A protein has these predicted regions:
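Short helix-loop capping/hinge segments that flank enzyme active sites or metal/cofactor-binding pockets
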Residues: 75-95, 256, 313-374, 395, ...
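Gly/Ser-rich, acidic/histidine-flanked active-site/gating loops
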Residues: 77, 89-92, 225, 242-316, ...
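An N-terminal boundary/leader segment
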Residues: 1-60, 64, 282, 286-288, ...
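Flexible N-terminal pre-Rossmann segment of NAD(P)-dependent oxidoreductases
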Residues: 7-11, 65-78, 252-253
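Structural helix-boundary/capping segments
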Residues: 21, 40, 117, 121, ...
Length: 484
């Protein structure tokens, strides 16, 4: 079979693997097509490293396998990108910050190793918000630069996993890995029109297979996790199955689903975004999904008591431990902070360094976080809910220039609010509770900017959440390729 370039670019991860396993598509041809795509779209700054030689060599090894050997590899010949804060053997891991530029780990992070063992090919490292400490991916580090949204290169892709999301949306790769602390897989997935999973944190088996704190440049051991991102829910489920060791997944039965709509996360939205989100709700309801309004009136207040204290307390010790364990070029947090290039990240680290024990961390971890987790558990149980559903962000992607020298944005002309409040408000509570979250496309604002919906599930219910996502995707559809 002969594949055109356009046909190759439109392959989902699942479709690409099936074609390569069947011998219908050579891995070398596919990788060459995607490498050319990456080079042609270098203006997006989606990647910090493009491994041309390594990717082609890996593709040649896949093509040299017999048909039976390829069939045994669940990701045979699948090109992926890995966020630049996740350790990759032989490829720079800099967290897109100057002090770590040139650092090359000697071992893959466990999640990366599982993908490679399954036949995946590392195309390169994905750009990101510097040190993962932000939600725009507007990076001023000279070796990185600001990531641009493929739907409109003058707008942010979201962050901090903006490079992974931009690369997937731009058809540079069909799938990849990001990380998520407060929303960093889900926010860029929403703004770029793709799918992103934040796995459960605290669910020992799943978390250990996804996340090794010594193999990912950290922010918070309580909240950090690696997460898969892809063009479709099936693609994300495929990567999740490889990493966790689970088997194939079928869509949930739509007519049996009870989905909660948490009132606090449906308030204060951009009007155009809310219209798209509510149109999606109507489609789900028409398909037989039962939608249940839930109050959760304490949600945001409880989250505030947890989030600030953790954000001030954990980064210093966690980053210091990673620097020492990895024999990094900079051996102190102060040494890393002194060379931070992005003003917003420098300000954040100045605050952390000035008051590393700020906030009531003990109270947050022993009282308020358990109460937040209890609120979620009671909400799921009391209403018999399978998941919660809400817009991933309060507004669509804003122009990059709007954030230059400012960290405040306006929603429909209202008084400006902090960018973190605008983009993190809806994703952060699940992060602090440790429950899984799945962002998937709901549609487009003005036919040009993606809107995402997020499904949050009970702790440890990742595979059930993905099954619901498969069912919802069949109703809502996926987004077309952006016109770049």
């Amino acid at each position: 079979m002969t594949w055109t370039v356009d046909q190759q670019l439109e392959l989902s991860a699942t479709q690409a693997v099936e074609a390569i396993q069947a011998g219908q598509l050579k891995a070398t041809d596919y990788v060459a097509t995607l490498l050319a795509r990456a080079q042609a779209l270098s203006n997006l700054n989606a990647l910090t490293v493009l491994d041309v030689e390594g990717a082609l060599a890996a593709a040649q090894r896949i093509d040299a396998l017999g048909a039976n050997e390829r069939a045994r590899l669940p990701l045979a010949g699948l090109p992926v990108v890995v966020k630049d804060n996740i350790n990759t053997r032989g490829l720079q891991t800099s967290a897109a910050t100057p002090a770590l530029e040139g650092f090359v780990p000697t071992r893959h992070a466990p999640s990366v190793q599982r993908l490679v063992d399954a036949g995946a090919i590392l195309l390169g490292k994905a750009n990101m918000h510097e040190l993962a400490f932000g939600i725009t991916s507007t990076n001023l580090a000279p070796h990185a630069g600001p990531v641009r949204n493929p739907w409109d290169p003058e707008r942010i892709p979201g962050g901090s996993s903006g490079g992974t999301a931009a690369a997937i949306a731009a058809r540079i790769v069909p799938a990849g890995l990001g990380t998520d602390t407060g929303g960093s897989t889900r926010i860029p997935a929403a703004l770029c029109g793709i799918v992103g999973l934040r796995p459960s944190v605290g669910d020992g088996g799943t978390q250990r297979r996804y996340h090794d704190p010594q193999a990912v440049v950290p922010i918070s051991h309580t909240r950090d996790t690696v997460g898969p991102m892809g063009r479709t829910v099936a693609d994300v489920a495929l990567l999740d199955a490889v990493i966790t060791g689970h088997g194939p997944l079928s869509p949930a039965a739509v007519t049996n689903l009870r989905i909660g709509l948490p009132a606090p996360l449906w308030e204060g939205l951009e009007a155009a975004l809310e219209d798209v989100a509510r149109t999606a709700l109507a489609k789900l309801e028409a398909a037989g999904v039962t939608l249940v309004p839930v109050e959760m009136s304490e949600l945001l207040a409880l989250n505030d008591r947890v989030s600030y204290a953790i954000a001030l307390h954990e980064p210093i010790e966690d980053l210091a431990a990673w620097l020492v364990a990895n024999h990094a070029p900079a051996q102190t947090v102060a040494g890393v902070a002194a060379r931070i290039a992005s003003p917003d990240v420098r300000a954040a680290y100045d605050a952390v360094l000035a008051d590393a024990r700020g906030g009531d961390y003990h109270g947050a971890m022993t009282m308020w976080r358990p109460r937040l987790q209890q609120l979620y558990a009671q909400t799921f149980a009391a209403s018999g809910l399978d998941a919660l559903l809400f817009p991933t962000t309060r507004l669509a992607a804003v122009p990059i220039d709007e954030l230059n020298g400012s960290s405040r944005v306006s929603i429909d002309g209202a008084a400006p609010i902090d960018e973190m409040e605008a983009y993190l408000r809806n994703t952060d509570p699940a992060s602090n509770a440790g429950i899984p979250g799945l962002a998937l496309p709901a549609g487009l604002v003005d036919a040009c900017l993606p809107v995402g919906l997020e499904l949050d599930g009970p702790a440890g219910g990742d595979r059930r959440l993905l099954a619901i996502g498969l069912a919802f995707e069949a109703i809502l559809g996926t987004l077309p390729a952006p016109e770049i």
